[in-house]
Amino acid sequence: MPLNEIIPVIENLISRGYIKKQSVIDAILSVPRHKFISKSMESYAYVDSPLEIGYGQTISAIHMVGIMCEELDLDEGQNVLEVGTGSGYHAAVVSKIVGESGKVTTIERIPELFENSKKTLSELGYNNVEVVLGDGTKGYLENAPYDRIYVTASGPDVPKALFKQLNDGGILLAPVGAHFQTLMRYTKINGSISEEKLLEVAFVPLIGENGF
């Protein structure tokens, strides 16, 4: 399946103002989304909507990945934590933006998705991504502190462990809520957390000790 099928999607996202930064555009253009889903779903790979990946989980819509990358204000060399690997697609896009001098740690609680995403990311050469099996609501102290943290599932609130593992000056992005969810952006400045509501969203539930 040709990767150039994503070009009209990207053009639409740019025209709607969802994505602006060239680094985000280039990253989404370069990551083969069809490699992160099952063969039976490949024909839908470059449709801008969430897709089932099994185990009650989804691969995020392309526009949502773009929006989150924009709002995280990603840059080369950053240390990033993703909570909820899923297919590994979102981590791949982020890894392209932070580059070889950066690192993405991504945590997945479902063993089958952990194995699948780890295999896909490795085969495609995303060597700056470390996939961890565990409870993402606890974060991952081994690679902390993080310049950026983002959560790909919605919890009742943001686990305190994630704020503790966020660098000063860092940004944390997470959907918050049960049925009605809001994508929130938190910034840590001199140890204090400021928050900003971004938009209404729909994510799968955040499961874990500090989630649902």
Curated annotation (Swiss-Prot):
Please give a single GO biological process term from the UniProt record: methylation
Q: What is this protein called?
A: Protein-L-isoaspartate O-methyltransferase
Job of this protein: Catalyzes the methyl esterification of L-isoaspartyl residues in peptides and proteins that result from spontaneous decomposition of normal L-aspartyl and L-asparaginyl residues. It plays a role in the repair and/or degradation of damaged proteins.
**HAMAP family in UniProt:** PIMT
Keyword Lipoprotein belongs to the record: no
The UniProt similarity line reads: Belongs to the methyltransferase superfamily. L-isoaspartyl/D-aspartyl protein methyltransferase family.
- Source species: Methanococcus maripaludis (strain DSM 14266 / JCM 13030 / NBRC 101832 / S2 / LL)
Q: Does the keyword S-adenosyl-L-methionine apply?
A: yes
Q: Write out the entry's keywords from A to Z.
A: Cytoplasm, Methyltransferase, S-adenosyl-L-methionine, Transferase
Name its cellular compartments.
Cytoplasm
Which terms does the record give in the GO molecular function aspect?
protein-L-isoaspartate (D-aspartate) O-methyltransferase activity
Alphabetized Pfam families for the sequence: PCMT
Cellular component aspect of the GO annotation: cytoplasm
Q: What class of enzyme is it?
A: transferase
InterPro entries under this entry? PCMT, SAM-dependent_MTases_sf
Any idea which residues are catalytic in this one? 60
Catalytic activity from the UniProt record: [protein]-L-isoaspartate + S-adenosyl-L-methionine = [protein]-L-isoaspartate alpha-methyl ester + S-adenosyl-L-homocysteine
Tell me the gene name.
Answer: pcm
